[in-house]
């Protein structure tokens, strides 16, 4: 590891560049899935009761970067308009600072959404390509009286959520002197998936849209308006007991049909039904559920489980608003299960072929997921993170007691996350909702909390946190 303190270092803040100390100089050409998400950075913030050692963190980060040279590289544009990462060990930004206040008692009743940016070393997405801008930043904030907060920003064009957490898990294991699996970076495994449809039809674009002139700009404009206060994240927690009751109810609905649904299917269906009621759309209106999925398990044998990059796709099961409101939990959960089952090796191969063709035709900058384009209208997007190891990121002082991220500006976006170890088996749910629906929830909070937690049994339902 090499560390270069910046000239701005002072008593309360230290900014350094952490490097592996070795560089291959290799150029990693990013895949079509990497390019689809673009060079935006994804934030993660972890709260620890005990104080972390900044010097030791910088040392272990330098060591683990030897296995993750992409993160200490820089992004560059290729002559054909594609993107690559030059593995030149230009380094990772590491900021260490001290807060004047004590550690807040964060949790589902007191999230860290408000002011969470103070724990992050931000990166502007339009200041990444062909610039000396790090693809990963760390900010370590020590709280008055003890405890530390670790905030990360990782460029989404190099890693999806699974890869992100595998890196953090590898770093934490390196920090504790434990082995960690080697990542697989070769993007050719994604290119090798490409299989044009047998009849020549462009079926690979079923969940993608090549936008017309102005449509993408209009979407970005709506997104900027939403980020200026038009969307609020509402948080609530479902206990393990509640989830078990939910799955039992869904299973009972499907008795005799030979259909199976998981606990996550049941929770997803329940959220879709409640949010569908909250949306209050006309009976004949189309309701879509965008199911974001890691496709590694569906293409095993071609894309290794250790693949480190973007391997995410989505499907969009749908029904009318009336059907969503009237169908049983089990029927809707079965539709969710069928939606995930669409992620076959053949479908992923056709999608890769479609994206490759759009890149070769020079139309790739206009390609967007239909799920994102429809987020202001017909689609609720759901990202299930419940199996990611948020509460396993232990840097020698124990697991974090809370994990959080800034509010999502895209309306009708739902994230499902695991709960901390003391609430093992539960789920924390974050819902980005438009202002009008948030107002409805606030005006009748007790009633709506009851709807969300109808499977909780007796007692007060878990509150909604705004």
Predicted region positions:
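Non-catalytic N-terminal regions of enzymes
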Residues: 1-208, 229-292, 296-306, 367-466
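A short, structured beta-strand-centered segment in the mid-to-C-terminal lobe
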Residues: 226-235, 302-339
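Non-membrane alpha-helical secondary structure
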Residues: 212-215, 238, 328, 347
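Alpha-helical membrane-targeting segments
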Residues: 197-229, 350-357, 361-368
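Acidic, glycine-rich loop-and-strand cores that form catalytic or ligand-binding grooves
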Residues: 329-398
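Macromolecular interaction modules
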Residues: 11, 40, 217-218, 323
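Short, compositionally biased low-complexity segments
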Residues: 32-39, 211-223, 304-313
